[in-house]
A protein has these predicted regions:
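Bacterial Sec-dependent N-terminal signal peptides
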Residues: 1-38
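Intrinsically disordered, low-complexity linker/terminal regions across diverse proteins
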Residues: 36-370
C-alpha cells in the first residue's frame, strides 16, 4: 500500500501550494534552484514511444541541507532510499522491464492507454527540500521532465503538446510511435477525473472527452487521435491529482525527426500574468510558444503587441518568435488574467531541429522562495 503521509499532509498545509515563486530565474541564476525544490513529488507515468525502451534516470540535488529521500511506486513494490547532500548530483536509474508492467517503473507500456494501472507512477518523499528531474534515456527521443513537487498537485489543469508538426505517427516509423498524451495519477480514493479536448479534437476513443475514477496511486494515460494536438485540453478532478502531458516522437513541420516534448504541468491556481520567453536556435517558425487562457476576457501581448484580445476561458494559440534565430533574446509575454505558456525550441541551428517542450513559470513575485 502506498504511504499516505504527504498525500494527506499537503492538504492541511495550503501554504505549500503557493510556492511557485519566481522560478523563471532558474534560467539565469543557479543560486535560485530552490524554485523547484520540495519534499514531496508525485510523478505520473511517462508513456512509451517504443515498447520496453523507457530507461529513466531520476536525478536529485539539494541546495542547503542533507536530505534523506525515499522513492517508491504506487504499491511500494519498488522502494529505494537515497541520501542527497548539498552540491552533489545523485542519480538512480530505472532500467529493468518489470513483469506485469512490460516497462520500467515510472513508464507506461504502449498498449495500455485508456486503462487504470497501479504500479507505474512514482512518488518521492524527502526530509529536506530537493530538486528532482526525470531523464528519458535513449539514443533517440531523449527528454527531461522537471518534477513540480506540491506545486504540481491540484484539481484544474490545461495541457499542451507541440502544434507545428507534420504528422502524428501511429504506425511504426523506424520502430517508433508518435503520440500526444496526457498522464494522470490520483492521490486519494474515488477521484473523479474528466479530460476534455478543445473543440474539433478527439481522443483515440473517438470522443472529445474521457471520464474515469481512480483510487489512490492509480494512474491513467489517454492519447489523442492522429494529428489532433493537446493544446487547450482541460483536465479537472474531484480530488487532487498530478498531471504530465506532451508529445512523443512528433515529426516537426520542417524535417524528419520525431521529437519528445513532455512536462509535468502546474494547476491553474499557480499561474501568473507575466512570462519571459527566451529565443532558441531554431529557424522561423519552429521556435514558438503556445498560450492558454484560463479566464474569460483575457488579453495577451508579446513585447506590447496584442496576440489575443478578449479571449474566452480555454482560448489557446501558437506564436512563432519572429526573425532569424537569436539565442537568448527575451520576449515578454503579459496578460490581464492568469495564463499557461509552453515553449517549443531547440539547440540545433538548422531546418530540422530536435524540439523539446516545457511549461514556462511566470515571473510574478509571490513573496516566497519555494
Amino acid at each position: 500500500m502506498m504511504a499516505p503521509y504527504y498525500i494527506k499532509e499537503y492538504l492541511t498545509r495550503p501554504a505549500l501550494l503557493r510556492r511557485l515563486g519566481v522560478s523563471i530565474v532558474v534560467l539565469f541564476f543557479s543560486s535560485m534552484l530552490k524554485a523547484q525544490s520540495d519534499t514531496y513529488f508525485a510523478l505520473p507515468p511517462l508513456y512509451e514511444w517504443q515498447g520496453g525502451q523507457h530507461t529513466i534516470d531520476l536525478q536529485f540535488s539539494a541546495s542547503s541541507s542533507t536530505s534523506n529521500v525515499w522513492i517508491y511506486n504506487s504499491d511500494t513494490s519498488y522502494s529505494q532510499n537515497l541520501v542527497v547532500t548539498p552540491g552533489a548530483l545523485v542519480t538512480t536509474s530505472l532500467t529493468n522491464v518489470i513483469g506485469g508492467l512490460s516497462s520500467t517503473y515510472g513508464a507506461r507500456e504502449l498498449t495500455w492507454s485508456n486503462s487504470k494501472r497501479y504500479k507505474d507512477a512514482l512518488f518521492i518523499e524527502a526530509s529536506q527540500p530537493v530538486t528532482v528531474t526525470e531523464r528519458v534515456k535513449h539514443q533517440f527521443n531523449q527528454d527531461i521532465i522537471t518534477g513540480k513537487g506540491t506545486n504540481g498537485i491540484g484539481t484544474d489543469f490545461y495541457v499542451a503538446s507541440q502544434t507545428l508538426i507534420l504528422s502524428t505517427v501511429t504506425g511504426s516509423y523506424t520502430s517508433y510511435y508518435g503520440k500526444h498524451y496526457v498522464s494522470i495519477v490520483a492521490l486519494e480514493d474515488s477521484t473523479e477525473v474528466l479530460i476534455k479536448a478543445r473543440p474539433g479534437n478527439v481522443f483515440d476513443n473517438g470522443s472529445d472527452s474521457v471520464a474515469f475514477i481512480l483510487d489512490q496511486g492509480q494512474s491513467w494515460v489517454s492519447t489523442m487521435a492522429d494529428d489532433d494536438v493537446l493544446l487547450g485540453t482541460r483536465v479537472t478532478s474531484s480530488k487532487p491529482i498530478a498531471v504530465t502531458a506532451g508529445g512523443n516522437h512528433l515529426k516537426n513541420s520542417s524535417g524528419n525527426p520525431g521529437d519528445g516534448g513532455i512536462d509535468q504541468v502546474t494547476p491553474v491556481e499557480h499561474l501568473g500574468l507575466k512570462h519571459v520567453v527566451l529565443r532558441g536556435r531554431s529557424t522561423y517558425p519552429q521556435d514558438y510558444f503556445m498560450y492558454i487562457a484560463t479566464e474569460d476576457n483575457t488579453n495577451i501581448t508579446v513585447d506590447g503587441v496584442s496576440v489575443l484580445t478578449n479571449g474566452s476561458k480555454g482560448a489557446s494559440g501558437t506564436y512563432s518568435l519572429p526573425g532569424n534565430a537569436n539565442p537568448g533574446k527575451p520576449y515578454v509575454v503579459e496578460s490581464n488574467e492568469p495564463i499557461y505558456v509552453f515553449q517549443v525550441t531547440t539547440g540545433v541551428a538548422n531546418g530540422s531541429p530536435e524540439q523539446g517542450m516545457a511549461q514556462l513559470p511566470h515571473i510574478d513575485c509571490t513573496g516566497s522562495t519555494f
